[in-house]
């Protein structure tokens, strides 16, 4: 097991897509002497089994910019790093059952137009041209974002990890953080199973384990909770095998679920009411 280096400018705790993305982006901002510590393998917490949706649709201007940056990055990372991300630019649909939904779509479209993310408000008849398997009963239209889609979370994380390493960052896997202490100098000492490291900054990107890491520095109420969520993947389907173009990710607010193509089958994710 590789012993950890003794000093760094910044230490990220957690090797999911959030921690690795931060590491990658800090190298792009010119930061040096960066370290990430992961207790298992990269993505081995919650990231690896995420459904990987990458929507452009949001009612927040700031999030719209983040979403657009993310999809543009996932499309370009393979050229930069040689590591495929598994991004599918199949587009997305959000179904509307009420005229109020359409009115909200116009508000959202104004935001996406402002940040440069293509978006359309389409009729029920136009939905059939994009997704032939949707029943149109009660549907009055949809919000269509043609350039987003979904990505492979593990492949995307590994591509950013390679980019971060290329930028000089160091990643230590299979090394659990056991404690974090503030030193009189104002620096932090991060204790791990394979040695200790002193740094200027610590980032808690531990996902489900964020509260535990927070308690190491006296933060008892980090606003992070786990949510129960399932998705199911069907067998291959003969009608999907006939398709020449991948189906868009579809979100149905009435069913509180999303649906997308997975290989030659479907992936369906319902949101539980009491999650």
Question: What are these language model-derived features?
Answer:
Residues 4-18, 35:
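Beta1/beta-strand and adjacent pyrophosphate-binding region of the FAD-binding site
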Residues 18, 42, 209:
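Conserved Rossmann-like nucleotide-cofactor binding loop
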Residues 27-48:
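Glycine-rich FAD pyrophosphate-binding loop
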Residues 52-130, 254-259, 263-267:
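Dinucleotide-binding Rossmann-like beta1-alpha1 core, especially the glycine-rich loop
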Residues 23, 27-28, 163-165:
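Gly/Ala-rich phosphate-binding loop of Rossmann-like dinucleotide-binding domains
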Residues 15, 58, 206-207:
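Glycine-rich, N-terminal phosphate-binding loop of Rossmann-like dinucleotide-binding domains
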Residues 21, 180-275:
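Flavin-dependent oxidoreductases
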Residues 143-201, 209:
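Helical element adjacent to the flavin cofactor pocket in flavoenzyme catalytic cores
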